Structures are given as structure tokens and as C-alpha cells.
């Protein structure tokens, strides 16, 4: 395997080089990193992304998605590969052994997302976006984030989604559940009876539709937030993809909560 990769590298003329200019051929192995490259204005450098990235249809997709084989990446002749914490260690090692500049970004928290954005801005010699605050808005309204009005999937401690709720001035009841991405039971929701329900929307739904769904639910119809209409519909991307949208989500969510 290693011999075949080295031979392919030789044929493509891939050799270690000093980084004297911003990268011109970039492969992104994660949707959030693709979003970051676009946000700083360097999208023209992308030569391939994962099938899960929001990118033009004519932009090549990396075979294997977010966990590709090194040969597939090497064949794209990149001068920079952007990888995440889930990129296989073997792939990272092989790419680096072949002299391909490979940067790994950890984005589990809002602070890490901001650090990644600043690092990418430096790499591409772009201006970093203005910082937003991660601090809590200082209120104590309890809330729950649900990935769908009829599911129990939520976000707990140790996730950037939890930090978004905190930045919006909300106390996340799922922080008391087990694990960073818990499945909340109906009894848990009834006992906690959150003041606000935030529904992560993947597109197409509006508040009235989701409220109607919640009010037909045999258990959730009894939640005070449902009876009183204290439901916020918010784009799911901010909670599910730790990228630029997450950094501004706290302020935007707080504004929506204040309208209730």
C-alpha cells in the first residue's frame, strides 16, 4: 500500500515544498471546514470537498467522504488538505509522509471554532471575521433543543450546541442527561418542563406547523412551553455543523427568544 502511494506521488510530482504563498489547491474533508473557507473568502481555492459539503455541484467530491483513502486525496494534487478530528489517523500519516501539507482542526466548542477560523484566515492571508461573544446573556430560562419536534435527540454538555443555548441566555436541561448528544425520554421532558423549546429545523417547517405537531403529541402537548407557544424554530445547521453559522447563532437565538 505505502509503495503504491509513493509511486503515485512521484508520478504526480508531489514533493515537500516551503509554504511561500497561500495554498491554491485545497481539499476539504469536513463540511464545517468547507463553510469556513467560504466564509473567509477563499472558496476559489477548493478543488474537492466531501459529498456532505454545501458546495457547487460542479466541484469534485472526494471518494470516501470524510474518511477517504490517501490515494484518493493524493490524486487531486492538493497543496493543502483540511482535516477534522474524525479523519482517519492512517490517512493523515500517509498524506504527511508524502509531503502534502495537512492541517487538522478540532471544533468541539465555540472557542475552538473561532480559533480554527482565525488559523484559516492566516493560512489564506485573509481577514478574520469579527468576534462574537460566547458569554451567557444572563437569564435563567430553562430550555431544550430538539432535533425535530417529534424526536428526543438533543445536545448536552461538551457540545458547541450547548454553548449556543448558553450564549442565548438559556439553561439547557439536557446538560443533566447522559452524554453529549442524548436521546431524551418523554418522562425526562415532562419532569423538566422547560420554559422554551428550540426546534432545530432542517428546512421547510414553520413555527405553526411544528406547534401543531407538538400539540398533537400524546405527551408533549402537556408541556407548558407547548401550551403557551414558547417554541423557537431555528436553522439546524448552527447546531449540527460547528462552523461560521454557530458563532453568530447565540445572538440570533437570543433575539428570537426575546420575541416570545
Predicted regions and their residues:
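Bacterial N-terminal signal peptides
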Residues: 4-15
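Boundary at the C-terminal end of the N-terminal hydrophobic targeting segment
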Residues: 18-20
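Basic- and aromatic-lined ligand-binding clefts that recognize polyanionic substrates
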Residues: 22-37, 123-168
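Structured C-terminal subdomain patch of bacterial secreted/periplasmic proteins
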Residues: 24, 110-125, 138, 203-260
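A short, structured surface patch at a secondary-structure boundary
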Residues: 24-86, 133, 170-173, 220
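Short secondary-structure boundary segments
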Residues: 30, 85-86, 147-150, 177, ...
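His/Asp/Glu-enriched short active-site or ligand-binding loop at hydrolase and phosphoryl-transfer sites
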Residues: 50, 158-181, 201
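Proline-aspartate-enriched helix->loop->beta-strand connector
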Residues: 65, 69-86, 100, 185-202
Amino acid at each position: 500500500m505505502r509503495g503504491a502511494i509513493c509511486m503515485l506521488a512521484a508520478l504526480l510530482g508531489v514533493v515537500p515544498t516551503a509554504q511561500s504563498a497561500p495554498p491554491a489547491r485545497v481539499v476539504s474533508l469536513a463540511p464545517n471546514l468547507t463553510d469556513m473557507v467560504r466564509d473567509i473568502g477563499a472558496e476559489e481555492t477548493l478543488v474537492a470537498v466531501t459529498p456532505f459539503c454545501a458546495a457547487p455541484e460542479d466541484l469534485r467530491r472526494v471518494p470516501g467522504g470524510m474518511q477517504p483513502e490517501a490515494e484518493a486525496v493524493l490524486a487531486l494534487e492538493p497543496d493543502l488538505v483540511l482535516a477534522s478530528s474524525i479523519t482517519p489517523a492512517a490517512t493523515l500519516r500517509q498524506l504527511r509522509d508524502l509531503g502534502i501539507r495537512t492541517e487538522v482542526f478540532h471544533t468541539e466548542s465555540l472557542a475552538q471554532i473561532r480559533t480554527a477560523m482565525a488559523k484559516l484566515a492566516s493560512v489564506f492571508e485573509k481577514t478574520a471575521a469579527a468576534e462574537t461573544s460566547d458569554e451567557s446573556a444572563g437569564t435563567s430560562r430553562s430550555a431544550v433543543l430538539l432535533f425535530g419536534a417529534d424526536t428526543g435527540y438533543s445536545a448536552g454538555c461538551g457540545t458547541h450546541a450547548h454553548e449556543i443555548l448558553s450564549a442565548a441566555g438559556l439553561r439547557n436541561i439536557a446538560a443533566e442527561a447522559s452524554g453529549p448528544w442524548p436521546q431524551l425520554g418523554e418522562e425526562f421532558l415532562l419532569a423538566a418542563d422547560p420554559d422554551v423549546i428550540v426546534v432545530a429545523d432542517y428546512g421547510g417547517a414553520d413555527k405553526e406547523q411544528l406547534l401543531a405537531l407538538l400539540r398533537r403529541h400524546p405527551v408533549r402537548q402537556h408541556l407548558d412551553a407547548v401550551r403557551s407557544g414558547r417554541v423557537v424554530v431555528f436553522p439546524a445547521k448552527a447546531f449540527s455543523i460547528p462552523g461560521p453559522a454557530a458563532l453568530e447563532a447565540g445572538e440570533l437565538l437570543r433575539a428570537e427568544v426575546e420575541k416570545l
